[in-house]
């Protein structure tokens, strides 16, 4: 239990501090029951650009479920493995959607090539940036930049590789870098649920508190009551919640023993 808790703490730390979690819920449907909820991200993105004194970046926090193929490598045939503490140590790459500010929000730096760009989002470019572990598993010693991945049959060009965040000998931390990040507009071809979760990266803890107040006020005027709701809070809320959960489980198991 302590091993799993320590590993999760390391993973939270690797994503960086001063992150704000934004959730926007909407329940608007037409007469046929189709979801016609508004996409709030463009408005939220533009608003956060005006908060540069406090905010470094903003990105959707969502993922895709797709098969990735390069040569003989196929994500659908990769086996998921866990260590004795039930930490994920190997498996297929995780697939994420992001804005041009995804790396800033997740404590990532580009080691090769380039990052996602604003025009990639606007022009629906079929490009991606991959993590260091994904590059190793799919490409070995070959430079991935410029290579093409097949993702559910669609071509996506690798434009960059993120530097490793995990230790070389820590398989669970390396798994954090086993990932592919697509422009969030790629969801039109790869699918996935409508975005409801977003991450805002603040400059420091004081700026995070200020951003929470400003963004909350902005969303109050943007999300109509009766057909939607929102929540803005420090992203380490989940870290605190996990710590409390692990402590409670430990107390229960200790009582049983």
Segments from the language model and where they lie:
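Short beta-strand boundary microenvironments
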Residues: 50-138, 158, 179
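Mid-to-C-terminal secondary-structure elements
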Residues: 101-116, 126-224
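Peri-transmembrane interface segments
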Residues: 4, 199-203, 209-215, 221-257
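Hydrophobic alpha-helical segments typical of transmembrane helices
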Residues: 8, 43-44, 183, 241, ...
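Membrane-proximal extracellular/periplasmic loop immediately following the first transmembrane helix
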Residues: 2-84, 89, 194
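Residues at or immediately flanking beta-strands
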Residues: 19-21, 57, 115, 148, ...
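Structural beta->alpha junctions
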Residues: 26-39, 84-89, 161-165, 200-208, ...
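Stable alpha-helical elements in mature extracytoplasmic
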Residues: 40-44, 99-102, 211, 245
């Amino acid at each position: 239990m302590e091993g799993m808790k320590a590993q999760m703490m390391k993973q939270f730390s690797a994503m960086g501090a001063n992150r704000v979690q934004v959730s926007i819920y909407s329940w608007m449907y037409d007469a046929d029951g189709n979801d016609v909820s508004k996409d709030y991200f463009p408005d939220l993105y533009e608003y956060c650009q005006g908060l540069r004194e406090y905010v470094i970046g903003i990105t959707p926090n969502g993922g895709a479920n797709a098969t990735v193929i390069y040569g003989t490598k196929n994500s659908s045939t990769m086996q998921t493995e866990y260590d004795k503490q039930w930490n994920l140590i190997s498996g297929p790459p995780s697939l994420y959607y992001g804005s041009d500010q995804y790396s800033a929000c997740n404590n990532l730096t580009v080691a090769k090539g380039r990052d996602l760009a604003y025009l990639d989002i606007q022009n629906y470019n079929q490009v991606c940036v991959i993590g260091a572990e994904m590059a190793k598993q799919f490409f070995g010693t070959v430079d991935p930049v410029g290579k093409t991945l097949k993702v559910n049959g669609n071509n996506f060009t690798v434009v960059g590789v993120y530097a490793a965040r995990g230790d070389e000998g820590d398989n669970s931390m390396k798994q954090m870098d086993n990932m592919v990040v697509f422009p969030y507009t790629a969801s039109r071809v790869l699918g996935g649920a409508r975005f409801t979760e977003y991450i805002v990266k603040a400059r420091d803890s004081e700026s995070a508190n200020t951003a929470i107040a400003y963004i909350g006020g902005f969303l109050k005027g943007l999300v109509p009551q009766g057909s939607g709701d929102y929540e803005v809070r420090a992203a380490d809320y989940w870290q605190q919640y996990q710590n409390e959960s692990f402590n409670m489980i430990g107390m229960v198991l200790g009582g049983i023993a």
